[in-house]
Amino acid sequence: MIEVVDLLYKNPHDIVRTPDQEASMKHLLLEEVINGATVNPQLQRDIYDLISVPEPDPENIMWRRDILDDFLSNPALFDDLRSILGIYDEICKGMRNATRGGGSAVVSKKELTGRDSQIFKMRSYADCIVRTIEMYEEAAKVFKPRRLMSEAFCRIKDFVNRELRKDETVKLKKLAAELAESITLDTSFIISMDLNKYFCVEDVEMLELDSNPYNYKDPKKREGFDPKARIEYIGFDSIDDGQLRLLVEKSIARLCRQMEHIVNELKRPFEKISRGIYFYRFGIGLENKIRELGLPVCLPSVDAEDKRCFECSSACDLWLAMNMKKNDRYCVPGDSIVANDIYLGPTDGSLVITGKNNAGKTVFLRTIGIIQVLAQAGLPVPAETCYISPVHGLYAYFTAMDTGNGRFEDEVKSISSMLDIVSEGDLVLLNEAFQSTAYEEAADVLCNVLAYAAASGFRCVSVTHLPGIKEHMRELEGEFRLPFRAKFAEAAVDSEGKPTHKIDFLRG
């Protein structure tokens, strides 16, 4: 059995989408971020479909991250691998042509049709076998000089070399090459037993032959018939015995099926590679885009043991940088965007951010959301360092101030829908929620959400103008002995009271 390595999943699983998750990605402007990193419409759709649902398995995240690291550390690797996949595409095209050129070779002993078609198929399949083994040889050349660290590429490199070292592979290529080069529509014999023996699918139906290939006996009537007997070839002339012609036609058809099977098996690993390569095309482009914007960039680190961790140094809002570049193509957003350090440890509860308008609170919140999405996909993030814990659910609600409409009742309904499905370790982002009603009522609702988060084990990061939240939360934490204490931060201002766009974490 040939090993198949999936470039996207070390541990494949089903993806579950929810309406709340989809709505959250719209609030985070994820689609705009993806579209800002690539102009390819199909790639935009494929990436959004993949990363809009957070990948919960840490092994899958690091699987992708390490593969991408290999691509980034070996700049020519991606193009070389694309060239190999070009051979794979040619093989697939050859298989399709062979299938379209084929037909039923056997209709009856009285009437034979499709011989030319079957010979064409046999020659096409033989050529595909040769090309497939050549694809393995090219892959070995690509991988040999490179220092690849990811488990995925190490496994691919090993199985490619393992297959090429087999004597059977060398013999198979030689036989298939002879068949592909020699057979024509006028061919009067075919090699059969060697290929049949190698494939070990089932014995081709053979008649007992002597030195004259047209003297034969019916094997069903011959005593002591050995179906495993080695026969190099069988032959026929177009004007000769119809029964022998039928035998050869059936042998060709069976041989075609065997060759089709072996090509499909040999190319199967490269089919998986072909299906997953798009992700790394985007990842390489995203890293280049972040650098082009003048932002810091790194690959994320993920620890399966730690939960509720979000640690970034010099984190930036990628959407803001892309939007600035869109409005002024000559600007370098990294020169003016203020980076923030973010630390939320395993024992920290929810985070509440307060401060003046237009002081960077919403930017800070969106930075957390976008970095969590990208990091959890194994993609580069706009930060100097990044260490996260994966979440099963990432939910976001940005109200009228930033994204559209939102009355108090609608806000309560939308956020309640999220809270109905949120689970331990999840992340909920709220921007200016519950601002459309009286301060006291809104503050009570928000504090209840934060208390519920502490009791349930998920984290809520909330931007708010509501007064008295810290005092109210300390009362609830003491009264109900909540296992996590909320943290508080505020948008900093300078000595003149102007926003610095830095977010300062408060003590106490």
Stretches with model-predicted labels:
Residues 1, 5, 161-165, 181-184, ...:
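Generic preference for hydrophobic/aromatic residues in regular secondary structure cores
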Residues 1-196:
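Conserved amphipathic alpha-helical "coupling/scaffold" segments
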Residues 20, 24-25, 29, 34, ...:
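Poly-acidic low-complexity segments
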Residues 51-71, 193-228, 242, 307-309, ...:
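Charged, low-complexity, helix/coiled-coil-prone segments
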Residues 57-58, 67-70, 293-299, 306-308, ...:
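Alpha-helix capping and helix-coil boundary motifs
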Residues 65, 106, 143, 147-150, ...:
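Residue-level signal for alpha-helical context at structural boundaries
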Residues 103-144, 148-321:
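Conserved P-loop NTPase architecture
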Residues 311-508:
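ATPase nucleotide-binding head domains, primarily ABC-like/P-loop NTPase cores
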